[in-house]
Amino acid sequence: MSKKSQLVFAMVAGELSGDILGAGLMAALQKTHPNARFVGIGGPRMEALGFESLFAMEELAVMGIVEVLSRLPRLLHVRASLIKSITELKPDCFIGIDAPDFNIGLELKLKAQGIKTVHYVSPSVWAWRPKRIFKIAKATNMVLSLLPFEKAFYDKHQVPCTFVGHTLADDIPLESDKACARQVLELDQEAEYLAILPGSRGGELKQLAEPFVKAALLIKQQFPDIRFVTPLVNQKRREQFEQALKDHAPDLEIHMVEGKSREVMAAADGILLASGTATLEAMLIKRPMVVAYRVSPLTYSIAKRMMQVNRFSLPNLLAGCDVVPELIQHDCTPEKIAAAVGVELNRDFAPIKAEFERLHQVLRCDASQKAAEAVLALVDFKEVN
């Protein structure tokens, strides 16, 4: 049992979705331990709650095998620095939030130093590179999983795992308010809108901005009155998207918003988006969607050999069947994207919406609170009077 006057947590979040999860966990821990200290790598939401970042979260926001290799020296430097700092800090627990290729190696080193470790968000070991489960078993004291089918996989391999649900399912109402979202964004209440989300990372926009913009041109031909709205996570991504628009569709009007991706999706009649956490958010908001994604040819070639599943998007993985169209790599073309969007906007959405509602209830578990309880049980903290 840990007996001290203050709980100390080291945490590393690797991207925007990890920042959201980290902030939720911090807030839940602060309810019972308001003086707890949090140190490591976090984003703006975590920092707003008092998180002490040793490096910018952007350092870890790289995608694809090839892209990671080009940044490897810097990533190794960051990890070595974190190992030194966290070992000296001697926190009650280290919590790695997603970013498994970075965090699991870090957890392995810290656990060897006697520090309790938690991995928040199960790596997709059930989908590809399943042998990672053995490294995870050595590296972590506990995995916090967001998806219900993951716990069975860990139980099978006798790795401690707690299913906590997903914070997005807790945060997003069961019925989203389109009119309110449009009012917030100052959008026309009567127009038809397609939300375009090409990702939050530079590498994603490099791959997806061009086909998404070109697809929008083709969609405009199918639906002359449709309007487009795109949320960009920051000014850098906005400039990147604006350049793609200038290069490939200079006469196309796309309303751009900084941040507010959830409001943009809620305001839309349909969504075109990159594969990733945003697909879960779109499912919870319950809008027709088309998921498209591509990476560098080498990254895809390597990943394809390792894949254990034939679905990529979270709605399809959760449903166990194809409820939304996926256009991956060679299928991620303007023509195929535009055709798929046309089908989704014209089809009867009611059966798909009903499935989205069912999945929303499954994931709605007060995730941050459950995660905090699991972490505190692991730490077994007792205050000194």
UniProtKB/Swiss-Prot annotation:
Keywords: Glycosyltransferase, Lipid A biosynthesis, Lipid biosynthesis, Lipid metabolism, Transferase. Pathway: Bacterial outer membrane biogenesis; LPS lipid A biosynthesis. SUPFAM superfamilies: UDP-Glycosyltransferase/glycogen phosphorylase. The keyword Lyase does not apply. Its EC number is 2.4.1.182. InterPro entries: Glyco_trans_19. One of its GO terms (biological process) is lipid A biosynthetic process. GO terms for molecular function: lipid-A-disaccharide synthase activity; phospholipid binding. It catalyses: a lipid X + a UDP-2-N,3-O-bis[(3R)-3-hydroxyacyl]-alpha-D-glucosamine = a lipid A disaccharide + UDP + H(+). The keyword Lipid metabolism applies. One of its GO terms (cellular component) is membrane. NCBIfam families: lpxB (TIGR00215). Condensation of UDP-2,3-diacylglucosamine and 2,3-diacylglucosamine-1-phosphate to form lipid A disaccharide, a precursor of lipid A, a phosphorylated glycolipid that anchors the lipopolysaccharide to the outer membrane of the cell. Belongs to the LpxB family. This is Lipid-A-disaccharide synthase. It comes from Shewanella oneidensis (strain ATCC 700550 / JCM 31522 / CIP 106686 / LMG 19005 / NCIMB 14063 / MR-1). The lineage of its organism: Bacteria, Pseudomonadati, Pseudomonadota, Gammaproteobacteria, Alteromonadales. The gene is lpxB.
